[in-house]
A protein has these predicted regions:
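Active-site metal-binding loops of divalent metal-dependent hydrolases
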Residues: 133-135, 171, 232-233, 264-266, ...
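Catalytic core of the metallo-beta-lactamase
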Residues: 120-123, 221-282, 297, 301-305
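Cap/insert and terminal regions of metallo-dependent hydrolase folds
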Residues: 37-66, 149, 156, 160, ...
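Acidic/histidine-rich helix-loop elements
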Residues: 135-152, 235-243, 293-299, 327
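Divalent metal-coordination and catalytic microenvironments
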Residues: 122, 132, 170, 227, ...
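Metallo-beta-lactamase
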Residues: 36-159, 163-174, 194-262, 283-290, 339-359, 363-366
Length: 376
């Protein structure tokens, strides 16, 4: 090990590690294993759901899934392990957006705007939707600690247009942001969430009559847009005592004659092929591609697995998400993009790795640019 890569065990170093990762990542690592979680206080029950067992939700059977490391090993690694090139030195490029930019988008088409990480603004036949919006500085329960953004969003919460619908994949802090939801609470016409997440939103000020809560394979419709909650292989929880009390999901969005898939967070599992078979393929697939590690192989896909899942889904365009905004793992900040770009080129897959703030029009040809190359 070189001196540059050798862990430093000073109080200042440990405090820095805690501020960067401690609060949210300790909760996440504990949630990976049942041993960290109390089984008491099962207030909400969803016995009608095939996914609900005992006092929580579970994944579909997957005999090929690899086990995760213990919570202690994960936590120890975040505290004293070596992290190299996980945070960019150079600024991440951002294309700032204005209301005029959004208004100029063809109201008859479907558009996807990259806000960062897994957050996206959609313009579906003239109406605006949000997916997993996170506008806060940190993906954490605290403003002073936890993973910090690499870049600003391309527009502010105050600049958002009227939002017709909002889709949530699960309740982790990098997908369900309290400050964002509290601001949007009365400004969104309809929320679509997995089972159990409704209660989270009500606690953030969202009106009860605006929330549609769905199990896997259940669907809903709002002003011409059809949505279906589909399976994912992940977990949920926001504290050390609420493991899997809410469901996690991927989503199918149908607008006009086009279908968009959003993976949410997921490990690789046979469900992707089932989703592809049931819906007959997708015009665009937003696929998780980041935060993977050999310590937690069941809950996040490697780039190779993301490509395989995309092929299982019968997608036309692979859109890479869940990267280049937060430092959530041990791979370099650019590794997800490097690997998926090379894999897609080798397998002749049409790839989309848009710059933050870039607009992708579904079904419209575009030239993909490796914008991250050359950045440190």
């Amino acid at each position: 090990m070189t001196d540059a890569a050798r862990p430093v065990f000073s109080p200042k170093h440990l405090l820095s590690r805690f501020r960067s990762y401690g609060t949210s990542l300790f909760a996440a690592s504990c949630a990976l294993v049942a041993g960290c979680v109390s089984s008491s206080g099962c207030e909400a029950r969803y016995d009608a759901s095939p996914q609900f067992k005992g006092c929580g939700f579970q994944n579909l059977p997957n005999p090929e899934v690899l086990p995760s490391a213990s919570a202690w090993r994960i936590w120890s690694r975040f505290i004293v392990g070596s992290k190299v090139d996980t945070v960019p030195v150079d600024p991440i490029p951002v294309q700032m957006l204005s209301t005029a930019d959004l208004d100029a988008l063809d109201p008859k088409a479907n558009h996807v705007v990259r806000l960062g990480h897994s957050s996206h603004l959609l313009k579906l036949q003239g109406k605006y939707w949000l997916i997993d919006p996170v506008f806060s500085e940190r993906a954490s329960p605290f403003s002073f600690a936890g993973p910090k953004r690499f870049h600003k969003p391309p527009l502010t919460l105050e600049q958002l247009p009227p939002i017709e619908g909002l889709i949530l994949s699960h309740d982790h802090y990098d997908h369900l942001d309290v400050a964002t939801i509290e601001y949007l609470a009365q400004r969104v016409q309809r929320y679509f969430v997995p089972l159990g997440v409704r209660a989270r939103l009500l606690g953030m000020g969202v009106p009860a009559d605006r929330v549609t809560e769905l199990d896997w394979w259940q669907g809903g419709e709002h002003n011409g847009v059809k949505l279906t909650a589909t399976p994912a292989q992940h977990f949920s929880g926001r504290t050390l005592t609420d493991r899997d009390r809410t469901l996690w999901a991927s989503w199918v969005v149908q607008s006009g004659d086009q279908r968009i898939f959003y993976s949410g967070d997921s490990g690789y599992f046979p469900g992707f092929k089932q989703i592809g078979e049931r819906f007959g393929g997708f015009d665009l697939a937003l696929m998780e591609n980041g935060a993977y590690d050999a310590y937690w192989p069941a809950v996040h896909m490697t780039p190779e697995q993301s490509v395989q899942a995309f092929e299982d889904l019968r997608g036309k365009v692979l859109y890479s998400v869940h990267n280049t905004t937060f430092d959530l793992a041990f791979h370099t900040w650019h590794d997800p993009l490097d690997r998926i770009a090379n894999l897609s080129q080798a397998r002749k897959i049409e790839l989309a790795t848009p710059v933050i703030g870039e607009v992708l029009t579904v079904g419209k040809a575009r030239t993909n640019v490796r914008w991250w190359e050359g950045l440190k």
